[in-house]
Each structure stands twice: as C-alpha cells, then as structure tokens.
C-alpha cells in the first residue's frame, strides 16, 4: 500500500471494531503499521516543557492478536528541539513503554471515546534507585510527553500550530479563529481535506506549513496539497501532494476522481478570480453534503492584477460569492424577476464571511419559498 492507502485503511478501521483494526494491520503488515504509528506519535508529541533530551524505547506489541507477530521496538529521542525516532531497540533504555498495536492505532485514529491504555506498561530502569524520587531523570518527562500524545491529552490551538509549522494563516493573516469556529465539528472526524496551494511558489522544498498544520489539527484526517508545482517533498504520513492546475477543470476532475469524496476544500492558490471561480465550480459538486468550501485572501478580488474589480462583477471572486447569497434565497424570487437558476441554488446551505475569508457550506436548499401571493404581488 502507498501512504494515503495506509492512512485511509487505518483511520477507517479505527472507526469500527478492534477486529476491523486488527484485520487492517494484517493487510498493511505489523512492522509497517508500527513505523506508521511511530511517525504519527513523533509528530504529535509536544516538547515545549522539555528541558533535557532523553531516549525512550517504545515497543509496539502484537501479543493479543490471534496470530501474534513479534513485537516491534522503536527508539524516540525527546528533547527541547523536538522528537526524532528510529527503528530498533536501545542497548540500555532508561524506560520501556509497551502497548498493543491495535489499541494504540485505535487511540490515535479512532473516535475520542474509544481511546484506551489498558494494555500499556511502563518499565523504569532506575525504579529501585531512591535518588529518582528526589531528582527525577530526564526520561520521566520524555515518557510523559509521548504518552500525552498517545492519549490525546495535548490539543493545541490553530494559532499555535500555524506558528509552529510555518503557516501564514496566523500573523499577517488572522484566519485561525474563524477556522476553529467552523472546523470544530470536523476535528474528531475521519475527514478528507484538500488545500489548493502548498506555498513556496516553484521551489519544491518550500511551503507545506499549512498541510502539516491541518494534519495535526485533524488527527483522523487525510490532507491533500494541490499545487501546479511538484511538492512531493512534503509528503508524509496522512499528507499527500498532487500536481494539478486550479484553472483547468479537467485537471481538477482528475484530482477529485483520484481522491474520492471530499469534506473540506481550502482555496489558497493563485487568488486569480477566474481560477477561484473555476476551482469552486469544479470541486464544490464533489464535496460531501455538510462539507465546507473555503476561499482565502478575498482582498485580491478587488485588485486588477488578480482579475479583480471594485464592482459586483460576478467574474470576480467576491462577485461570484455574492451571487451565491442570492442563490440562498432562490425560492423567494418573484417569477417576473426572470432570474436564471444556478447549479448551486439547491446545494449551498449557508455562507459565512470574515475579513478576506469565506466559508460555503454544502447543504440541501430546496425550500418552496414564502406565501406565493405575497411574493408575486406588485
């Protein structure tokens, strides 16, 4: 399996029973699953309170499976600068954490209510040394940080995640509060997120901060970064990049066909009005009911260099979105208005505007309108 398939298989199975998760692990492979979970655990571990680095051995155990495989040890180095990890055991570990692979996968990728540490054990090398009671060694907080990540006890906000991962969504832009307002119901779901625009322009190594931010925020999510340039260097577990052109409907349709149903689209691409309209017109129909389509940096809709204008021209990004507001009330138009039906009239359920930022919700909107006698009166 490739990385997106592994991620989808684990996330989907973790939403079912433990038997489903065990079967998924068998399909992926025990060592491969352990490596995937080690990457996830390292990425979620918060180290801001760590003062001294320490190494911890984490053993991914499979003893509870009917056809148990050998345990898989990994080594984590937890320090003030972050977390690194590698396959293999330590010769003389200060601490050994052991946990069932299925249980840990379900804790990391399943619903919050299904988290468990019932199979976990922690062995301390110096447990019989009375000095550790008065002078705790660095391995103590290192283990605590890893377990906090495994148990979901660290829930960072988007502003902090944006700063940590180098996303521009907080700072000059102050989008994170609006994102948290609208994305909160999705945070514990197995969502598919598509962001147009990886960042860094043509530099294959630059950008990617927002993709990593979304990965950390949506702990069960799969994140796809779409860019006209090759950004494959930013691929990692649960983050995939795709080369596509947001101005080309065929390119976007191929993208949607490959990804499957989408829950959230974030357009942080070229910001050229024609491209924004094309991307919305192509991808909004592929959005799941209840999903959100987000358009960033709407200030460019007023700038001629981005095909913008100051009026309500529907060819601009803001003008196009204003037309969607009319579509919300499509059932209230008098027949004499002669308003042509739009493809989005019955599928846009709400719009939310913030400075330079808009959220469009996909939801059935097939109301019959108010009292026709009053609507048609002159």
Swiss-Prot record:
Which residues are noted in the entry as S-adenosyl-L-methionine-binding?
Answer: 195-201, 210, 227, 245-246, 268
| E.C. designation(s) | 2.1.1.305
Reactions listed under catalytic activity: 8-demethyl-8-alpha-L-rhamnosyl-tetracenomycin C + S-adenosyl-L-methionine = 8-demethyl-8-(2-O-methyl-alpha-L-rhamnosyl)-tetracenomycin C + S-adenosyl-L-homocysteine + H(+)
Q: Cofactor(s) for this protein?
A: Mg(2+)
Q: Which residues, by range, are in coiled-coil regions?
A: none
Print the keywords alphabetically.
Antibiotic biosynthesis, Magnesium, Metal-binding, Methyltransferase, S-adenosyl-L-methionine, Transferase
Where do the catalytic residues lie?
Answer: 271
| A biological process from GO | methylation
Which InterPro entries did the record assign?
MycE_N, SAM-dependent_MTases_sf
Molecular-function annotations in GO: metal ion binding; methyltransferase activity
Q: Does the keyword Cell inner membrane apply?
A: no
Q: Which residues bind Mg(2+)?
A: 268, 296-297
**EC supergroup of this enzyme:** transferase
Name the pathway it acts in.
Answer: Antibiotic biosynthesis
Entry's family note: Belongs to the methyltransferase OleY/MycE family.
Protein purpose: O-methyltransferase involved in the biosynthesis of the permethylated L-rhamnose moiety of elloramycin, an antitumor polyketide. Mediates the methylation of the hydroxy groups at the 2'-position after the sugar moiety has been attached to the aglycon.
This protein is called 8-demethyl-8-alpha-L-rhamnosyl tetracenomycin-C 2'-O-methyltransferase
Identify the species of origin.
Streptomyces olivaceus
What high-level taxonomic lineage is stated for the organism? Bacteria, Bacillati, Actinomycetota, Actinomycetes, Kitasatosporales
